[in-house]
Each structure stands twice: as structure tokens, then as C-alpha cells.
């Protein structure tokens, strides 16, 4: 009986979604996107799409999203939005970071990306246009992946800060006390594997099409580059997401080394009280700001 009720509710929800979808205006980008997708399927193998497609998506999105933060250091107007104004970026630091990033991308992440095709084949994940999910279902699954990754990240990140292992692995990521966008994936290879596992758990549980893999890569990179940007930009649309950590939240983690362990959402830090120092610091800064006015 309970099973029948659940099926009935699911069917009703699906019908409601279909009805709302029928009322929405036609997406002008859908036809060009469909043509490009079909062309890709006709001209490339699944292995090429899964491997080189995933690599291109990752590298393009990573450096494209990192570019604004890199340019901000040369724009005097943007200085007022930099969170740690007393710690400007240096050429030496950024060059060291870039070399570390490229090593991780091509010697750690690329071998993992090469397994994407075998992953999709093992789990029967489709590539075809006919089974392409609607954008809002993909978005919902990406949010599900974000919740799963954030949970994994909080507890494993906190473990990496344990005094007995911190200096061996996670200390590499904290070489930069004032983070900047491209530094988001600068880490010890073991950390890349440990924290990166959280990215794949959601994919294993929720992936219904290869497009979700690329959409989730895009969302995760956008988020991690934003929180590592070192800038608190007004009207940043990401800051309107409920419980979103944001640049100030994670910047404090780099400045203080303790607390604010979550990657995307604030609830785990709030539940376990690991944001107490952060809130005390923000209150102190507010009082100092009022006194200086």
C-alpha cells in the first residue's frame, strides 16, 4: 500500500513538472546544442568523448573561471573588494601555484579522467540525445552531488587538519595564507585523491547521463574557484544560494587555519561549532569598522 502511494506521488510530481515545462517558452539554445551534441556523437567515439571531452571541459572551465580573479590584481578599483588587503599576490607565488596545478592536472587527474569511459560503461550511463535529461533535473542532481561532496569534504578536510597528519598532506594547500582563484586545486597529490573522492560519490549515486558529469564538474569548479578567489564581490549571484559558504567564509579558513572546513554549505560548521572563531572575528571587524567611521 505504501509502495503504491509512493508511486502515485512520484507520477503526480512528474505530471506536474511536465505541465509546468509545457508552459515555459522554448529554449532558443536547445536546437544549436542538440545539433552540436549529435555532431559530437557522430564524429567521435565514446572513449574520446568521455576522456578528451572531460579533460577539455575541466581545463577550459578551470582557467576561464580563474581568469577574472587573476586580472583583479591589476585593477586598482577591485582592491577594495580584496578580503586580505595586506597580502597581495606575488608573481613567484602564482608561478609556483601554476606549476603545481599543472602537475596535479596532468599526472594525477588526467589518469583518473582516462577511466571515465570505463566508468560510464560499467554503470550503463547513456550518451545519446534521446535520453538527455531536462536541465532542471540535471540542476537538481548537481545540487544533490554538492550536498554529498560537501559532507565528505567537511569530515575529511577536518581530519586532514589533525596535528599528526597536517604537515604531511594538507599543509601544501595552506602555503598561501591569502587564497586566489587558481589556487583552488593546488594541493598535495594525496589530498587531490582523498578530497576528490567526494566529487565522485555523487556521480556514482546520481548520474543518469554523461552530461551530468560535465555539469557537475562545471558547478564544482565555479564554487571552489569562487571561495578561493580572495575577493568578496558585491551582487555575486552565488552568495544568494541558501547556506552558501562564499569567499569570506573560506578565506578565514586560510587566514586562521582552524575552522570553516566545509566546501560549499555552512551547516556542518554550524552544527559542530567549527565556525565560532569565524563569527567572533566578523563581529570584531564590524565593531572596528563602526569605530573608524
Curated annotation (Swiss-Prot):
Pfam assignment, any one: FA_hydroxylase
Primary subcellular site in the record, as a coarse category: endoplasmic reticulum
Residue ranges of the motif Histidine box-1: 157-161
Cellular compartment(s): Endoplasmic reticulum membrane
Keywords: Cholesterol biosynthesis, Cholesterol metabolism, Endoplasmic reticulum, Iron, Lipid biosynthesis, Lipid metabolism, Membrane, NAD, Oxidoreductase, Steroid biosynthesis, Steroid metabolism, Sterol biosynthesis, Sterol metabolism, Transmembrane, Transmembrane helix, Ubl conjugation
Motif Histidine box-2: where in chain: 170-174
Pathway field: Steroid biosynthesis; zymosterol biosynthesis; zymosterol from lanosterol: step 3/6; Steroid biosynthesis; cholesterol biosynthesis
Transmembrane regions: 55-75, 100-120, 199-219
Protein name from the UniProt record: Methylsterol monooxygenase 1
Biological source species: Rattus norvegicus (Rat)
